[in-house]
Structures are given as structure tokens and as C-alpha cells.
């Protein structure tokens, strides 16, 4: 099952079919749907706030590429490419997928756009001084159509007013 794309979303979904196929292999069905939903929402927010729509779509699509990877494999990937976790990060396994995902995108998929890599890296923790793309992906992950936590509708309304909340 996939979200329904319209307009540029349909075009980008076709253009990045190779990445979609990789995601199908790497992610559970639920996480795959989530990744497509985040891509859709990131595209919408990019169009609304003046970011690059295609870059936002691609980043949203790939943001959880390592989420379903075993923690041991995530650590191996990080170590293989010289990324060492600090003591705080070592204790937060649920956040490793953002670091390993950024490495995977750069080293395995050969996407060398620093903005995309950074947006994937910080999509779980955020950071001070986030770029527009980082904010969009962070908030798209939080408000995508598959999310159903208490207060999500309020968050969706808020991101339609500003990305600065």
C-alpha cells in the first residue's frame, strides 16, 4: 500500500523508483508506507515554504532507510566509515538509524548533497540553527499522514502556519 501522490509527487515517485525498490527491500511494510508519507508531506511543506521540492521529497523518502536495520549492523556501518558515537549516543539506540542512514545515503547510495545528508542525520533529534530542509524533514516525519498520536492534528495545523514552533 502507498499514499496517493498527485502533481509533482507522482513525477518524483516515478523518478526515484530505484530508491523506492531499495526501501521495499530494507523496510517493513509499515515503515515503507511511512517513508512515502514523509516524502509526500516534505514535498508539500517545501512547496509551501519555498524549499526545493524535489530535494525535500527525496530526503523524506530516504530518511528512515536504516530504521529497520539491526543495531549491530548500524554500528558496523558507522564504524566502517569512521563514525564514532559519543557516550550519550551509544545509549540511545533508537536514534542510531539517523546517523547510519546519513552514512548509508552518502557512502552506499552515493548521494553527496550535504543538505540531504544533514537532514537525514538530524531528522530525529533536530539541532540549533537547522536549515529549511532539515526543519521540513523533521516536521514532515512528525506530521505525515500515517501518524496518529494524540495532538497530531494540532501539529499539522501548526506547521501550516510556521515551521518555527
Language model features with spans:
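Generic N-terminal amphipathic, Lys/Arg-enriched alpha-helix
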Residues: 2-27
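N-terminal glycine-rich anion-binding loops that anchor highly charged ligand groups
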Residues: 33-34
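Charged, low-complexity surface segments at secondary-structure and domain boundaries
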Residues: 1-8, 153-159
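Divalent metal-dependent catalytic cores for phosphoryl transfer on phosphate-bearing substrates
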Residues: 21-25, 45-164
Amino acid at each position: 500500500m502507498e499514499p496517493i501522490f498527485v502533481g509533482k509527487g507522482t513525477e518524483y515517485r516515478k523518478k526515484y523508483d530505484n530508491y523506492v525498490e531499495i526501501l521495499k527491500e530494507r523496510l517493513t511494510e509499515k515503515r515503507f508506507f511511512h517513508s512515502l508519507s514523509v516524502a509526500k508531506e516534505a514535498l508539500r511543506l517545501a512547496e509551501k515554504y519555498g524549499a526545493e521540492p524535489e530535494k525535500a521529497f527525496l530526503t523524506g523518502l530516504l530518511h528512515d532507510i536504516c530504521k529497520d536495520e539491526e543495531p549491530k549492523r548500524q554500528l558496523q556501518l558507522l564504524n566502517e566509515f569512521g563514525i564514532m558515537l559519543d557516550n550519550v549516543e551509544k545509549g540511545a539506540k533508537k536514534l542510531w538509524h539517523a546517523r547510519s542512514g546519513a552514512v548509508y545515503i552518502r557512502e552506499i547510495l552515493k548521494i553527496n548533497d550535504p543538505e540531504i545528508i544533514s537532514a537525514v542525520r538530524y531528522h530525529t533529534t533536530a539541532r540549533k540553527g537547522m536549515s529549511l530542509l532539515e526543519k521540513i524533514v523533521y516536521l514532515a516525519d512528525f506530521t505525515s499522514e500515517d501518524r496518529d498520536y494524540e495532538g497530531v492534528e494540532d501539529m499539522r495545523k501548526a506547521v501550516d502556519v510556521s515551521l518555527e514552533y
